[in-house]
Amino acid sequence: MKQLGEEHPLISTKRPRAKKRRSIAICAAVLTLIAFGFIRFVPKDILAGGWYEGEKDGLSALDNEEVRDMQTDGTTFELKHIFHRGTGSHNYMVHRRLDVTKEYLEAHSEELEELTTMQTSEVDESNLQDVYDAYDWPQAHTGKNPWTIKLQIRQSPTNGVVKRLKERHTPNFLDSYLAYALSVKGNPALLNKIELEWEDEHEIPIPDVKDRDTVVSLATISSNAYVKFPKDDKEKKRSDWIDVGDPWVPDENHTDINFGWADDGLRGHVFVSTDNKTVVIGIKGTSGAGLIGTGPEETTANDKLNDNLLFSCCCARVGYMWTTVCDCYQKAYTCDQDCLEKELMRQDRYYQATLDLYRNVSQLYDPSTTNIWVTGHSLGGALASLVGRTYGLPAVAFEAPGEMLATRRLHLPQPPGLPKHLENIWHFGNTADPIYMGVCNGVSSSCNVAGYAMETACHTAHQCVYDVVTDMGWRVNLLNHRIHTVIDDIILAYNDTPPCVQQPPCRDCFNWRFTSSDDNKNDEPPLPNPLHPKPPSTVRSSNMPHEQSPNASRSLSSLCTEPSCTSSFQSVSPSFSSQLPSHPSQNPQRCLRRTWYGRCSKWGHNSAAHHVSSI
C-alpha cells in the first residue's frame, strides 16, 4: 500500500505544466485582442503608408467595408486622362486627349507589364550615363504601374483664401488682357484704368502640404508625367487619341506630325479623385540632353529652348560662343525687354501651351464645381506656378527653377489687396539641388556644359526647403534634382515636411540693363566719368542778383496785374535774355586739352577742337 506522501511528487510535477499552458493560452488571447483592436481602430493612413494600393500593398488586413470607404472618401486619385498640346512652329495647333479607361488598359496590358519591368531594374548610380538612361520612378512605388497606381491626397483642414478674375474662363479674355499688358509693358497706372472685375475673397480647398504622404503623392504625380508610353513607332500612330482642337488633317509637307503619342509638345497627366470633385494636373518637366537630373525623352529640344527662355537673363546669352534662343540680345549685358516678353508670349511656347492644357481640362471638369490643382517637377513645376497664378489655382512645384523673373515678364494679373502670404503656391526644394538654389551656372557647371542657362534663383509665394546640406551632410550635385531622389531620399527620409516661408527680397539679373523701344532716356542714370567732367555753366547767377530764370519770369508776370508792374518787368527781361546762350544744345563745349592726370585745362567747341587738332 502506497503512502500518501509518495503521490505528492507526481501531483506536484503535473500542476505547474497545466498552469503554464493556461498562461500561454491567456497571453495568446490577449495578443489577438490587441492586434484586432490595432487593425480596427488605428487610422488607415498609418496602415497604408499614406496611399492606397489594394491588397498587394499591405492593406489585405482591412475588411472590404474599410477599403470601400477609402475609395469613396475623395482622397484616392487615379490617372484618368493624358492631355497633349503641341509646340514648335508646326505642331502648336495640335490638342489631343487620351482617356485611360479599363478597356484601354486591357488592350495595352503587354506594354504595361514591360513598363513595370523597366522601372524595377537596378541602376548603377556611379555610372552617370546609366543614371541618365534610367527610368526615373521612385523606389517607394517599386512594382507599381504608373498607369494604374492609386494615390492618397488629403485636403488641408484649413481652406485657402483666393481672389480671382471673374471673367478668367471667358473665351479670349485672358489672352486679350495679357496682350494689352504686354503692349503697355505692365504699367500699373494704365492697367488700373481697365478696372478688372475681381471676385470677392473666398475660401477654396487646398492640398495639405503639411502632410508628408500628401506631398509624396503630389511628387509622384509629377514623376508620372515623365512616363514614356507607348514607345514604338507603330503604337505612336494608333488612333487612341481624341483630337480636342481643330480637326486633324494629314499634312504632306510635314510628315513628322503624327496622330497619336507626339514627340514634340507639352503633356499633362490628369489624376481624378474617386468622387470626381478634385482634379490634379501633373505637368511634365524637362527632358534634358546631357542634364543628369532630368529624364531622357523626345521633347528634349523644345524643353531646352523653353528652359533657356524662362530662366535665363537674355535668351541664354552666357558667352560669345553660345547660340541664343531669340534675337533680343543687343550688346554686353544689355537686352531688349520688349523682345523678351513677346518671345515668352508666342503661341508655340510652353506658357501658352500650359494655358491651353488647363482650358482643355476645364472643358471636361467644370471649375465652378470641381477643385483643380496643378503640380510639376523642374520645368513642369515652374509652369504649374505660372498657370496657378494666372487662374488662381493651388499649385505645388518640386525643384523648380526660379520663376519670379518670368512672372514679371509675362505681367500676370495680381489680385489687389491679397497679401502675399495667402498665395496658394508652394515650392518644394532642397539645398543640395543647384537648379532650385539658382547656382547651376558658371563655366564649369553641369548646366553650362549641357547648354542650359539656368540663371534665376528667385521664386514667388512660399518656399518649403529641405536643408539636406546641414541635416545630412550632402553636397550640391545635379543628381539631387531628380524626382526619384527627392521622393525616396529626402521627403520620405524626414518625419515632417519643412516649414513653408515667404520668399525673402530677391532680384535676378541685377547686372543686366533691359531697354525698351519707347525709352526717351536711359533706364538708369549714367555713372559719372572722372575723365569727362561737365563743362562750366555759362550763366553766373551769383554775380547777377537781379537776374531771374525764365520760369521765374513767367511766374512773376503771371502775378503782376498793374500796368506799371508789367512795363518794369519787361524792361528787365531783355537784359536777362541777352546773358543766355542762343543755342546751348546745338554747339556744346568739350574738353580740348587735359593734364597728365586727366583734369581738363581748356574748354571749347567742336570747331575749336578741330582747329587745335589741325595745328
UniProtKB/Swiss-Prot annotation:
EC number: 3.1.1.3
Domain of life: Eukaryota
Catalytic activity: a triacylglycerol + H2O = a diacylglycerol + a fatty acid + H(+)
Catalytic residues in the record: S378 (charge relay system)
Topology in the lipid bilayer: Single-pass type II membrane protein
Chief localisation class: membrane
Subcellular location: Endosome, Multivesicular body membrane; Prevacuolar compartment membrane
InterPro entries membership: AB_hydrolase_fold, ATG15_Lipase, Fungal_lipase-type
Keyword Transmembrane: yes
Keywords for the protein's UniProt record, in alphabetical order: Autophagy, Endosome, Glycoprotein, Hydrolase, Lipid degradation, Lipid metabolism, Membrane, Signal-anchor, Transmembrane, Transmembrane helix
Function: Lipase which is essential for lysis of subvacuolar cytoplasm to vacuole targeted bodies and intravacuolar autophagic bodies. Involved in the lysis of intravacuolar multivesicular body (MVB) vesicles. The intravacuolar membrane disintegration by ATG15 is critical to life span extension.
UniProt similarity note: Belongs to the AB hydrolase superfamily. Lipase family.
Protein's UniProt name: Putative lipase ATG15
Organism: Debaryomyces hansenii (strain ATCC 36239 / CBS 767 / BCRC 21394 / JCM 1990 / NBRC 0083 / IGC 2968) (Yeast)
Organism ancestry: Eukaryota, Fungi, Dikarya, Ascomycota, Saccharomycotina
